[in-house]
Amino acid sequence: MSENRIRIATRKSPLAMWQAEFVKAELERVHPGIVVELLPMSTKGDVILDTPLAKVGGKGLFVKELEVAMLEDQADIAVHSMKDVPVDFPEGLGLEVICEREDPRDAFVSNLYKSISELPLGATVGTSSLRRQCQLRASRPDLIIKDLRGNVGTRLAKLDNGEYDAIILAAAGLIRLKLSERIASFISAEESLPANGQGAVGIECRTNDERVKALLAPLEHLETRYRVIAERAMNTRLEGGCQVPIGAFAEIHGDEMTLRGLVGNPDGSEIIEGVITGPKTEATKLGVALAEELLSKGAKSILDAVYAKA
């Protein structure tokens, strides 16, 4: 492999391609003369579009094919939305870099209404995220919530066709695809706690590939890493997957980190919440401690019930 060449495995969706192009541009910026190739490929998550994610295996659906490409030396790195990255990595692969975070909030998208509070009784809202569904049902039990799969363009088309009164998407995806004008309003973290890692881009590579790791190093954003590591540590301790509504959101002020988390029933009938503050350098410890607090407050019974049905 040429010392000055790097191959990026990426999904083919517009948002995944944006992320890969972003990393390509950053690599070209910090390493003038580098040759960066994109290798677009389909994953199971891109193919199975008629079934809710929670029912077909969850987050790993979007990364497995990319990981195989790296393990077989067909690609050097893979670029992911951090909220799609599973907790565990195959042997020989690891998360090397977390890039600076885009807006982590959820976005309310509607052609008719400006916010959730404006929605009339019984309005239809589209989202496949159990985390969003749970928090929405808790605040607005009158709403009819329907699953919504597909890439961002497909989801917007379904809204425009009148299948939904509103849909909820990650703000970061709309901003990156230059579709900010479609955002009727941003949903505060207090109203809808984001998913762990939402808005952040991660780069995975072979753990023994020192050449690639050295090329990637300048793309690391340490503050984003602290935040995402805390959020993921909480999720890991809870053994959270796509079948359970879990939200985690860390903010940093100076050297202090505040991490908020929640676990809910999918129907929104019960939500366990918690918050913890501590040194940002102890991100993992804070995430685990908050998870323990949530478990002791009743999250364990919610998780046990959900996994018993799975």
Curated annotation (Swiss-Prot):
- What does the note accompanying the cofactor annotation read? Binds 1 dipyrromethane group covalently.
* Modified sites of kind S-(dipyrrolylmethanemethyl)cysteine: C242
Catalyses which reaction(s): 4 porphobilinogen + H2O = hydroxymethylbilane + 4 NH4(+)
Please give an example of a GO cellular component term from this record.
cytoplasm
Q: Name one GO biological process term.
A: protoporphyrinogen IX biosynthetic process
State which Enzyme Commission number(s) the record gives: 2.5.1.61
Alphabetized InterPro entries for the sequence = HemC, Porphobilin_deaminase_cofac_BS, Porphobilin_deaminase_N, Porphobilinogen_deaminase_C, Porphobilinogen_deaminase_C_sf
Q: Which family does it belong to?
A: Belongs to the HMBS family.
Q: Name one Pfam family in it.
A: Porphobil_deamC
Q: Extract the CDD domains matched here.
A: PBP2_EcHMBS_like (cd13646)
Class in the EC hierarchy, top level? transferase
Its name, as the record gives it, is Porphobilinogen deaminase
State the encoding gene: hemC
Q: What's a Gene Ontology MF term here?
A: hydroxymethylbilane synthase activity
Q: What else is known?
A: The porphobilinogen subunits are added to the dipyrromethane group.
Q: Give the required cofactors.
A: dipyrromethane
Family matches, as SUPFAM superfamilies: Periplasmic binding protein-like II, Porphobilinogen deaminase (hydroxymethylbilane synthase), C-terminal domain
Query: Which UniProt keywords are listed?
Result: Porphyrin biosynthesis, Transferase
**Biological function:** Tetrapolymerization of the monopyrrole PBG into the hydroxymethylbilane pre-uroporphyrinogen in several discrete steps.
**Pathway(s) annotated for this protein in UniProt:** Porphyrin-containing compound metabolism; protoporphyrin-IX biosynthesis; coproporphyrinogen-III from 5-aminolevulinate: step 2/4
Q: How does the record describe its quaternary structure?
A: Monomer.
From which organism does this entry originate? Shewanella sp. (strain ANA-3)
